[in-house]
Amino acid sequence: MAKTHEIKVERRADEGKGASRRLRHAGVIPAIVYGGELEPVSIQLNHEQIWLAQQNEWFYSSILDLNLNGDVQQVLLRDMQRHPFKQLIMHIDFQRVSANEKLSASVPLHFINEASSPAGKSSEVVVTHELNEVQVVCLPKDLPEFIEIDLSTLEVGAVIHLSEITLPAGVEIPELKLGKEHDVAVVIAKHGQVEADDVADEAAEGDAK
């Protein structure tokens, strides 16, 4: 089970663009929490606290405990609006999760032992990570903070597909149920010369058009 992280929030009394603008000037982020059998609730969060939290991977992929005056609700981050050029978070959406209902979430992929693998030891091999995250379905208690992929045995020319990822108990990748064409490559270990030839072929095709 992934570690949970508590974030203290307050109920937001005033709504609208003017009220939200005043909150942001005061170092506060307007937000909303929705979902489940409860009504949506307008809340506000400390900008400094969230700015630090959002620099961590867990903020985007873990269950968060929203503490509203002692009332703790488990949520997932669903949307975060940022200012186009300032270091400013404009608004956040959180969705409540139910312990007995499966949820869909994006989970980061962590690749380990690449350098010590046969492919990683070769200076002539290019290892590419085609995916850095994957969409999963599971109960909240089973949601992993990340999924680890061990590349220690990765050989030259090998391809690791989505179906080959070792998943934690209770976790599924729904895309794999859509057919073999959705079993996409996650890691490719390609000989550098092969990649160079591919680039040359693409360039030649472009010149021919």
Curated annotation (Swiss-Prot):
Domain of life: Bacteria
GO cellular component labels: cytosolic large ribosomal subunit
A family per Pfam: Ribosomal_TL5_C
Keyword Ribonucleoprotein tagged: yes
Keyword Membrane part of the UniProt annotation: no
Keyword annotations of the record: Ribonucleoprotein, Ribosomal protein, RNA-binding, rRNA-binding
Listed InterPro entries: Rbsml_bL25/Gln-tRNA_synth_N, Ribosomal_bL25/Gln-tRNA_synth, Ribosomal_bL25_b-dom, Ribosomal_bL25_C, Ribosomal_bL25_long, Ribosomal_bL25_short, Ribosomal_L25_dom, Ribosomal_uL5_bac-type
GO biological process, one term: translation
Gene Ontology terms, MF aspect: 5S rRNA binding; structural constituent of ribosome
Function: This is one of the proteins that binds to the 5S RNA in the ribosome where it forms part of the central protuberance.
UniProt subunit comment: Part of the 50S ribosomal subunit; part of the 5S rRNA/L5/L18/L25 subcomplex. Contacts the 5S rRNA. Binds to the 5S rRNA independently of L5 and L18.
Family: Belongs to the bacterial ribosomal protein bL25 family. CTC subfamily.
HAMAP family, A to Z: Ribosomal_bL25 (MF_01336), Ribosomal_bL25_CTC (MF_01334)
Protein name as annotated: Large ribosomal subunit protein bL25
Lineage: Bacteria, Pseudomonadati, Pseudomonadota, Gammaproteobacteria, Lysobacterales
